[in-house]
Amino acid sequence: MEHIRTPKVENVRLVDRVSPKKAALGTLYLTATHVIFVENSPGSRKETWILHSQISTIEKQATTATGCPLLIRCKNFQIIQLIIPQERDCHDVYISLIRLARPVKYGELYCFSFNPMLDKEEREQGWVLIDLSEEYKRMGLPNHYWQLSDVNRDYRVCDSYPTELYVPKSATAHIIVGSSKFRSRRRFPVLSYYYKDNHASICRSSQPLSGFSARCLEDEQMLQAIRKANPGSDFVYVVDTRPKLNAMANRAAGKGYENEDNYSNIKFQFIGIENIHVMRNSLQKMLEVCELKSPSMSDFLWGLENSGWLRHIKAIMDAGIFIAKAVSEEGTSVLVHCSDGWDRTAQVCSVASLLLDPHYRTLKGFMVLIEKDWISFGHKFNHRYGNLDGDPKEISPVIDQFIECVWQLMEQFPCAFEFNERFLIHIQHHIYSCQFGNFLCNSQKERQELKIQERTYSLWAHLWKNRADYLNPLFRADHSQTQGTLHLPTIPCNFMYKFWSGMYNRFEKGMQPRQSVTDYLMAVKEETQQLEEELEALEERLEKIQKVQLNCTKVKSKQSEPSKHSGFSTSDNSIANTPQDYSGNMKSFPSRSPSQGDEDSALILTQDNLKSSDPDLSANSDQESGVEDLSCRSPSGGEHAPSEDSGKDRDSDEAVFLTA
């Protein structure tokens, strides 16, 4: 609170970017964690909340006759324009937000003060929801080819890797340590994904420190061990995700890429994904196009093309497609690296895994994928997404691009994913919000030192608790898209990829539909499910009624058989035709034959019994069947007194009624 100069400013206007004349008048509040704007409208006090950690840039614009404008751009692509009456108040708010949006230490972040009213046990359960050891067991590990190594115990070999790593069984500790010394940041080749159908694998590392001629025997043996771990292939693909010119330039700095003359049985492949600086500039250009107030269609499309954003998305997708095909169709293992192995490597490994394994296309499986390929393997969340005040050149939308790749796949395979667009948007939001502890720090080691699991809460538990909000209504577990590998063409054109307005323009009220397609489909699905349940209940009732009808028919057939003990003639002429013929003789008339059992008599239902046993059916029988029950009514509308013949007639009428 010591950084807040002015906690409250009144008569502030919130400008609607689509309709600038419709500015809302209200009060601006600054708290330790949020910027809050509360409208003064008498009808409703609408509130707009912005986390300080979501603020990307703050721009204090030139003072006008109406006040001093303040433009706030957020990391979740929300844009807030405020007009503060007094220039002094605007300056105080500006200085306060500059400091609050750039904390200098982790303890100032929102997650350390966020309290969702859960006890210690619930918090601990949230952190164990995603268990990577169970995920590797699901892959079929360890086995004859891969083993769990403790060589990185206490992070003694590589401080940005997790402590538990899977390596080829033939790779000894000596080979692993030697290979780590020959790799940038000591990030030696380790397993990322194992395709148990054909024993092919996806491994990841950083670039080798080869320069122009250097070599390392242990590193060469490490790649040979990866090849031997796949008995179905005699070579390994080495995929360098960088443009070839960039990789060659790194050779001058003593780094570079593998020399095929030194590494036996490898095939090299360059992909051409640009570095973090190009991606940051590309996103900025695209957002400038999104901020245009009234662009023409040609201006928007030209600006989108000029930004190059979709070309970069396609490059990442092409890399994932190549790796997925190499693993599933060729049965060949792949080693992936970029420069340091924590940006582009994470992108393409996770995209390839998503294409290969339908488990990662489920809600919990996608959480596991991010936990495995991004969090545990040391993606630099703090540097890339500006959690703390630091070098702005380190910021880049790396995981944003991966999330968009997933959305592009969802657009092409709408039935293959259990989750919907909202799920992806909420994950992207919380990567920047710092409300949960999952995406803090640059490595598992840093998170362990800060005791993140003891001091913060897990996002995965929050998403899982509200999983009903993130279900895809088109997902079918038995659909062909949900089984096996997703096959995408690597065609040289961009028409397959779309601009994601649901992400980048989701706060533009005038551009978004009032009801999303997902919400509409979910409502239709729920209504359909309700109707199916009602239909099932009606079918069960109909089946019961048909059984009763069948039993009634059997009883009547038994009643019509000649009885040796009744003393009555079975001739049609001896049976009275009207109830009056039986008057005074009712007690002597048998209601059933002596041979008929008690259980049969229990199945004879009169109309009154039917009404009492199922009131819903009796109440609606006339309306549902369209047949009025006339057997119990006199022509004048009165009720007949019960008699044997009337009961008999009701049986026959009842059968007609039930059949209807």
UniProtKB/Swiss-Prot annotation:
The active site is at residue 338. Residues 641-653 have a biased composition (Basic and acidic residues). It catalyses: a 1,2-diacyl-sn-glycero-3-phospho-(1D-myo-inositol-3-phosphate) + H2O = a 1,2-diacyl-sn-glycero-3-phospho-(1D-myo-inositol) + phosphate; 1D-myo-inositol 1,3-bisphosphate + H2O = 1D-myo-inositol 1-phosphate + phosphate. One of its GO terms (cellular component) is cytoplasm. Pfam families: Myotub-related (PF06602), PH-GRAM_MTMR6-like (PF21098). Residues 554-660 are annotated as: Disordered. Residues 126-504 form the Myotubularin phosphatase domain. Its main location: cytoplasm. PANTHER family: MYOTUBULARIN-RELATED, MYOTUBULARIN-RELATED PROTEIN 7. This is Phosphatidylinositol-3-phosphate phosphatase MTMR7. It comes from Pongo abelii (Sumatran orangutan). The gene is MTMR7.
